[in-house]
Swiss-Prot record:
GO terms for cellular component: cytoplasm; plasma membrane. GO terms for molecular function: ATP binding; ATP hydrolysis activity; DNA replication origin binding; lipid binding. Keywords: ATP-binding, Cytoplasm, DNA replication, DNA-binding, Lipid-binding, Nucleotide-binding. It comes from Shewanella oneidensis (strain ATCC 700550 / JCM 31522 / CIP 106686 / LMG 19005 / NCIMB 14063 / MR-1). This is Chromosomal replication initiator protein DnaA. Plays an essential role in the initiation and regulation of chromosomal replication. ATP-DnaA binds to the origin of replication (oriC) to initiate formation of the DNA replication initiation complex once per cell cycle. Binds the DnaA box (a 9 base pair repeat at the origin) and separates the double-stranded (ds)DNA. Forms a right-handed helical filament on oriC DNA; dsDNA binds to the exterior of the filament while single-stranded (ss)DNA is stabiized in the filament's interior.
Length: 460
């Protein structure tokens, strides 16, 4: 009875939550009765804590509405419900190669000359990319949580998993971390990672060698397929056709698919609607540019791995000025470390200013309050004058608040200076705008998307 009640509760939650919230937090839950207690099993600690913190009141309220004093007690646990646990599958043959392929490597992922019956899968997962060395922050928290769940339960609730965001934000790191997690749990798993261009190259090579059946057999018999930068399938009709059928075959067999892109699935031009629709069948998660604290943590971790003692004030100095992506941060730190090694000088703020003077000058030139105002006004299709006006209609006030929040995040200007740039507003108005936008980014998918798009535009 209570399990049936949980199914009704799921229907209520699906109506009340966004599609992403429901897929991320509610869909993975499993329910089972234990005496007079309904136990909800979460796939990991992160999901358990989130559901218990955010949704337990809604769940309990629904149970009380339906059953009054007879409502079951509620308990949370981690794992799968006992009756749902399956026997371990029989291992399947696979071949690991010691040196992982990269996006730039050449050749094909499958051997067009081998017999059809001997489809050999080379696991090209990079062992250096692990969850343990992925620096987590608010910008990538959901992405990491989803990736962890996929590593623990491939082919489960988050299938396909679609990660999107700008260049250098850690999407590829998460792909390899998932692959390493799957292989750790099942060393014989057939896990294949590749850039989308490799899939296209393999298909072309298969056509040239009259080996299209081997191509199909190879890709449709993997346990997990991870494809980076799926947007490069744009306008490649034959590749899209083959991937469409591969996608369907893998999902029907409960084999895991993870895709990445630099944009939201529906915004990928040149890709068929039927594919874009399927990209959203599982879970779609944005990976955003890292916030200040995460940027500092990334720098400190990288310095530690390099055996360098990076002073806190230096890490904050770099992190406040370089905001676009992780790759840029790490590149800047590598330059600082190299200069310090060559010159023997200690790493101070003045030293960093000198070592990164061209990079810092370019960044400060690109991101100004005026540039932010113009970019936001153009994005929301309002007049530049509206940014400075006293108008309070939501169509104007909300973009103005977004621009203020971006100014605080992307420039080194103080709150009073930002207020002055927005028509002489008080610093408390700017602070309110920043807090309001931070709240809306948690609650509104549209605002979250808008903010991420503007960050990418201003940082590119």
């Amino acid at each position: 009875m209570a399990v049936s009640l949980w199914q009704q509760c799921i229907g209520r939650l699906q109506d009340e939550l966004s599609a992403q919230q429901f897929s991320m937090w509610i869909r993975p839950l499993q329910a089972e009765m234990d005496g007079d207690t309904l136990v909800l099993y979460a796939p990991n600690r992160f999901v358990l804590d989130w559901v218990r913190d955010k949704y337990i009141n809604i769940i309990n309220q629904f149970f009380t509405e339906q059953m009054g004093n007879d409502a079951p007690k509620l308990r949370f646990d981690i794992g799968s419900r006992p009756s749902a646990k399956k026997p371990e599958p029989a291992p399947v043959a696979a071949v690991r190669v010691p040196s992982p392929q990269t996006k730039a490597s050449v050749g094909t992922a499958f051997n067009t000359t081998e017999p059809v019956a001997n489809t050999n899968h080379r696991s090209n997962i990079n062992p250096t990319y692990q969850f343990d060395n992925f620096v987590e922050g608010k910008s990538n928290q959901l992405g990491k949580a989803a990736a962890l769940q996929v590593a623990e339960n491939p082919g489960g609730a988050y299938n396909p998993l679609f990660l999107y965001g700008g260049t250098g934000l850690g999407k590829t790191h998460l792909l390899h971390a998932v692959g390493n997690g799957i292989i750790k749990n099942n060393p014989n798993a057939k896990v294949v990672y590749m850039h989308s261009e490799r899939f296209v190259q393999d298909m072309v090579k298969a056509l040239q060698n009259n080996a299209i059946e081997e191509f199909k057999r190879y890709y449709r018999s993997v346990d997990a397929l991870f494809i980076d930068d799926i947007q490069f399938f744009a306008n490649k009709d034959r590749s899209q056709e083959e991937f469409f059928h591969t996608f369907n075959a893998l999902l029907e067999g409960n084999h895991q698919i993870i895709l990445t892109s630099d944009r939201y699935p529906k915004e990928i031009d040149g890709v068929e609607d039927r594919l874009k629709s399927r990209f959203g069948w599982g879970l779609t998660v944005a990976i955003e540019p890292p916030e200040l604290e995460t940027r500092v943590a990334i720098l400190m971790r990288k310095a530690q791995e390099s055996g360098i003692n990076l002073p806190d004030e230096v890490a904050f100095f770099i992190a406040k000025r370089l905001r676009s992506n992780v790759r840029e941060l790490e590149g800047a730190l590598n330059r600082v470390i190299a200069n310090a090694n060559f010159t023997g000088r200690p790493i101070t703020i003045d030293f960093v200013r000198e070592a990164l003077r061209d990079l810092l000058a370019l960044q400060e030139k690109l991101v100004t309050i005026d540039n932010i105002q113009k970019t936001v006004a153009e994005y929301y299709k309002i007049k530049m004058a509206d940014m400075l006006s006293k108008r309070r209609s939501r169509s104007v006030a909300r973009p103005r608040q977004v621009a203020m929040a971006l100014s605080k995040e992307l420039t080194n200007q103080s709150l009073p200076e930002i207020g002055d740039a927005f028509g002489g507003r008080d610093h408390t108005t700017v602070l309110h705008a920043c807090r309001k936008i931070a709240q809306l980014r948690e609650e509104s998918h549209d605002i979250k998307e808008d903010y991420a798009n503007l960050i990418r535009t201003l940082s590119s």
